[in-house]
Amino acid sequence: MSDLKMQRSGGEPLDTIKAYIALTKPRVIELLLVATIPTMLQAERGENNIVLILLTVFGGWMGAAAANTFNMVADSDIDQRMGRTRARPLVRHTVSNRDASIFAWVLTVASFLWLWLLCDSMLAGIFVLITIFFYIFVYTKWLKRRTHMNIVWGGAAGCMPVLVGWAVIVDQFEPGVPQQWWQAIVLFMVIFFWTPPHTWALAMKYREDYKAAGVPMLPVVRTPVQVTAQIVWYSVATVLTTFLLIPATGWIYAAIAVISGVTFLFMAIKLHLGIKNGGKVKPLKLFILSNNYLAVLFVALSVDAVLGLETIGEMLGWTTTFF
């Protein structure tokens, strides 16, 4: 009746609850909030259906929590070999793999039904199912352990909240109202291009962890100069993509997109030049900045949409339904 048995049983009820919460990776789910709410506000620009937004966020949260839990089950073998993941519930046996899998399946079904029945959008529910399938089978089980481009293509799963949010809003539109899916695609691509520099900056700090676990992240298989060069290129792509949305937004988003974008690029280039010139650099600074950059950008989009400001496209006389 050792401590190990108590550990495997999950200990006190509060500890078990904390373990299940940890399975969902709450910090990762922050991206869901950052992406979904501004996207929905932009889609309905000026309407601000708060109840529908909150319902969608909760439904999306269940889907993201399911994906993250499945991910922990699939990665439990390598998590025990990485210093920063050894305290995860499945490694410490506070939750069994079987119970975690059941938890993930319940969340998956609940998320789909929630979005379909309560948010009146089967399309949003289907997007969540696609996200979970892609994240587990394409990224976790296939790409992650086989290619240094894992996060580039696998990161597409993290972009899906914008499509979920947009789908819920446009499914409420009357027939004939332009759905303007191009805006959702732009926001999808912003997160798609943002994910690699964000992740690689963190992976540079934990390079030895990934190496020990046999995960071929770019910093493991390429030199720091090569890694930071890729970070710069993807940062450029991110910033340029944010500009594509300017015609459909007001001056607040436009100004923040330019100012924050220049700052993000400056820090990415500074990191690259610092390493290239043999200086002492801290990649984690770029990781933190990238988080703040995306948050500020989407907050600006939210404020712009809530205020219902005249769009740049309207200011320029572009009166087509495209904008």
UniProtKB/Swiss-Prot annotation:
Q: Which UniProt keywords apply?
A: Cell membrane, Heme biosynthesis, Membrane, Transferase, Transmembrane, Transmembrane helix
Q: Which residues form a coiled coil?
A: none
Q: In which pathway does it act?
A: Porphyrin-containing compound metabolism; heme O biosynthesis; heme O from protoheme: step 1/1
| One GO MF term | protoheme IX farnesyltransferase activity
| Keyword Lipid metabolism applies | no
Broad EC category: transferase
Q: What is its EC number?
A: 2.5.1.141
Q: Which reaction does it catalyse?
A: heme b + (2E,6E)-farnesyl diphosphate + H2O = Fe(II)-heme o + diphosphate
Q: Where in the cell is it found?
A: Cell membrane
Query: What Gene Ontology terms for biological process does this UniProt record contain?
Result: heme O biosynthetic process
User: Does the entry annotate any disulfide bonds, and if so which pairs?
Assistant: none
Q: Which domain of life is it from?
A: Bacteria
The record, for InterPro entries, names: Protohaem_IX_farnesylTrfase, UbiA_prenyltransferase, UbiA_sf
Q: Which GO terms describe its cellular component?
A: plasma membrane
**Topology versus the membrane, per the UniProt entry?**
Multi-pass membrane protein
**Which residue windows are transmembrane per the record?**
50-70, 97-117, 118-138, 150-170, 184-204, 231-248, 252-274, 293-313
Q: Main localisation, per the record?
A: membrane
Q: Which residues form the signal peptide?
A: none
What is the similarity comment for this entry? Belongs to the UbiA prenyltransferase family. Protoheme IX farnesyltransferase subfamily.
Function noted in UniProt: Converts heme B (protoheme IX) to heme O by substitution of the vinyl group on carbon 2 of heme B porphyrin ring with a hydroxyethyl farnesyl side group.
Task: Please tell me what else the database record remarks about this protein.
Answer: Carbon 2 of the heme B porphyrin ring is defined according to the Fischer nomenclature.
**What is the protein name for this chain?**
Protoheme IX farnesyltransferase
Species per Swiss-Prot/TrEMBL record: Corynebacterium glutamicum (strain ATCC 13032 / DSM 20300 / JCM 1318 / BCRC 11384 / CCUG 27702 / LMG 3730 / NBRC 12168 / NCIMB 10025 / NRRL B-2784 / 534)
